[in-house]
């Protein structure tokens, strides 16, 4: 299913293909086209990888690239990090499958027509937006 770009808004929750972790890459012995085999790129050890949800924070969505904050499963220590916003599954189960952390400190720009696979939710609720803005302010002040 293709993405309807007219339905992409700031604060939308999207599904993004972030790339293949280096540890999953089979180094070819011949001249195999790596971009053909790994179209979303090969990530180093600490780069965000695989398919994850993200929240669009760009204001100008007509650009080919947009800025997002990725979401991932909540891990031990996330609550102590001021650059992380924790979302409880029980409160947001209409779009989350488990407790989730917004990685505000992993803000990144992506090529929207290549990386975005689908729009999950057209916009997140205002309380989540406020938490993201506060975490951004605390992280980058």
What residue spans do the PLM features occupy?
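C-terminal terminal-subdomain/extension
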Residues: 1-6, 80-141
